[in-house]
Structures are given as C-alpha cells and as structure tokens.
C-alpha cells in the first residue's frame, strides 16, 4: 500500500489537480518540491528527457498559473484582458532545475483615460504573482525580466512597438534586447493576446537582414567548448576553476541557433529547442542531418546538466569533469561535435562576416 501512496503522490496528473486547489503560495512550495522528486525518479528510471521536459513544464505552468490566480483572488478581477507569458527556459519548456523566473505581462489596449488605472492594477498583480513565485522557490530574475518590472508590464500596443524597435533597429537596443523574449509560453490569460505577439514577431522577421545579422552574431559569440586538440576548455579561475561551463559553451549556442533558424524559416508555435531542430529538418531537408544531430546533442547535454544540478542542488551549469567516467566523457565530447557544422551553416546562411 505504501508504494501506491508514494506513486500517487508523485503522479503528475494528481499533482496538477492539487496545485489547482491550493490556497497559498506556502502550500504551492510543498508541491514544487514534489516536482523535484518526479524529475529525479524519472531520470533514475531513464525516462527520455524530452518526456520529462513535457511533464515538468506542465507542472511548472500549473504552479505559475495558480500563483497568478491567487494574486487575482487578492486583488479582485482584472479591469482588462491580459496574458501572462513565461519567457526564457520555461517559455521553451526546458526548465527542470529551479532557475530564475522570467515573465512578461501583456494587457489589451484600453481607452487613454483608463490606461493609468489599468496599468496600476497589472503592476500590482505582477508584483503579487512574482512574490508568490518567489515563495515557491523561483528566484527573481537578476536581469529584471519580470512582469513586475514596469518595463515588462505593458499594453499590447506598447509591446508591439517594443518588438518593432528591437527587431528593426537591433543595434540601438542591444542592452535590453534579450533573445529570450522570442521564447514564450502563456501561463495564464487570453490566447488571442499571445497570438498577436507572435504575429508581430513573425511579420518583423520576414527578410529582416539586420535582425538576423544581430541574432546570428549573438549565436556565434559563445566560446568554443573544445580546444583545437579536442580537449575540454575549462574555467581557469574563480569558484568553478577546472570545471566545464556546459551552459555557456554547449547549451546556449544550440538554443540560440535553433531560435535563429526557426525565426528565419517562419516556424511558428514551436518554442522548444529540440522540437525546433526537428521542425528545421523538415523545413530545410538538405541540412536535415545537422539539425537532427543537434536535436539529439541538445538532449544529451541537457541530461548531463540536469544530473549535475540535481546532485549539487544548483543550476548544473558547471560540470566537474573529474567525476565523469571515461565513457561519459566520450559521450559529452561527441555531443559537442555537431556544433561545428551548425556554426558553418549559420555563417553561410546569414552571410555573417563582421562579428559584433
């Protein structure tokens, strides 16, 4: 009987039902801790990572949605329709470890004399929601990419202007133009608003050389993972000395490249790195092999990072190579191989010559 109770406790469907009924952020935290158990036991059982991503993403979304609902219960019903979008890793459904919360809030356009009151309400809502999320364990984003930041809580028209200026004059706005704003998933609200944002992005992306130049250079800016002699390039100093930065040197280049190509091929509705590469293999069959290798490499690398993060209760960004056996080191090295070809493909497709 005991095993059954434990497996019920860690059943994703049951967990989501409980989240929907929860009355406080403190209780949500207990349910978030169970998600970590689910992730750990799934990895232990060797369940495919892509499947684990989907389960975790559903549970994370339910937690975020409930955090916003609890804030609404406190504040009273919203004066206008809105959408709460997760951006970054949760927007890509790639959040397994507790990382920062990244979000934006988009509310529908209202008549000018109502604007201030409406915006006031949504700023309050965003503050409450993010503080609920903080209680659950999602730390506030260090870059301030949060709906509760005045910059990231605005009307649909203001967001439209924001994306227009980011995408049409990327150089001018490079300080706050973060590519994570192109990875989004709605946690709460009006799907029409999310569609409107998506349409703005894809309209601006059409044959926008300047924008792809910017994103392309951005994707190529990360440091190589292996030296010329195929040795891992490790941290030379600081608290992570001698460790391998799997996030910056391996995962980010794949995440950035998948986004870059997906936007340039107009692939809509797919914000996940693995799925983006699979879709690209269909959109650009001539280079299908490269994309499929990258999709698989992404999962392999992500699994290394997740295991490291669960072991150390951190973000898993730095891999201690001395703790890997020979076989794992080989697997890690092989997963870095497709990046070379991908880099050539980017330079070729976007004719990148100058590196900003």
Feature map (PLM): residue ranges:
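Conserved catalytic core of two-metal-ion nucleotidyltransferases
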Residues: 31-43, 53-66, 74-81, 115-181, ...
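Glycine- and acidic
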Residues: 42-53, 106-116, 237-243, 285-286, ...
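Catalytic metal-binding acidic patch
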Residues: 92-120
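Short beta->alpha transition motifs characteristic of CBS
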Residues: 1-10
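… and, occasionally, acidic/histidine-rich disordered N-termini of signaling adaptors
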Residues: 76-90, 98
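Generic beta-strand/beta-sheet core signal
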Residues: 85-87, 104-108, 141-143
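Conserved nucleotidyltransferase catalytic core and NTase-mimicking acidic/glycine-rich helix/loop elements
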Residues: 80-82, 192-193, 198-356
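Long, non-coiled-coil amphipathic alpha-helical linker/lever segments
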Residues: 15-49, 325-344
């Amino acid at each position: 009987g005991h095993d059954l109770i434990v497996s019920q406790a860690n059943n994703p469907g049951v967990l989501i039902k409980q989240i929907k009924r929860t009355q406080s952020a403190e209780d949500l935290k207990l349910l978030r801790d169970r998600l970590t158990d689910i992730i750990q036991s799934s990895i232990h059982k060797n369940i495919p990572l892509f499947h684990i991503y989907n389960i975790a993403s559903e549970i994370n979304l339910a937690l975020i949605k409930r955090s916003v609902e609890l804030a609404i219960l406190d504040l009273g019903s919203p004066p206008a329709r809105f959408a709460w979008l997760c951006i970054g890793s949760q927007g890509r459904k790639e959040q397994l470890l507790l990382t920062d919360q990244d979000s934006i809030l988009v509310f529908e356009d209202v008549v000018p004399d109502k604007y201030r009151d409406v915006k006031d309400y949504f700023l309050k809502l965003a503050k409450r929601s993010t503080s609920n999320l903080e209680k659950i364990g999602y730390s506030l984003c260090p870059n301030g990419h949060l709906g509760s930041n005045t910059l990231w809580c605005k009307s649909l028209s203001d967001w439209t202007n924001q994306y227009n200026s980011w995408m049409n004059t990327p150089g001018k706005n490079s300080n706050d133009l973060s590519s994570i704003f192109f990875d989004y998933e709605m946690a709460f609200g009006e799907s029409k608003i999310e569609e409107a944002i998506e349409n703005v992005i894809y309209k601006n992306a059409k044959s926008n050389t300047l924008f792809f130049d910017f994103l392309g250079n951005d994707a190529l800016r990360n440091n190589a993972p292996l030296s010329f002699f195929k040795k891992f390039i490790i941290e030379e100093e600081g608290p992570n000395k001698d460790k391998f930065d799997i996030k910056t040197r391996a995962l980010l280049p794949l995440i950035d490249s998948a986004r870059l190509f997906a936007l340039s091929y107009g692939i809509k509705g797919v914000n996940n790195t693995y799925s983006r590469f699979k879709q690209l293999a269909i959109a650009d069959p001539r280079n299908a092999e490269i994309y499929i290798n990258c999709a698989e490499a992404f999962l392999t690398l992500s699994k290394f990072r997740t295991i490291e993060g669960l072991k150390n209760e951190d973000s898993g960004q730095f891999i201690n190579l001395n703790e890997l056996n020979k076989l794992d080191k080989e697997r890690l090295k092989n997963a870095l191989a497709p990046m070379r070809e991908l880099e050539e493909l980017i330079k070729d497709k976007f004719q990148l010559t100058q590196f900003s």
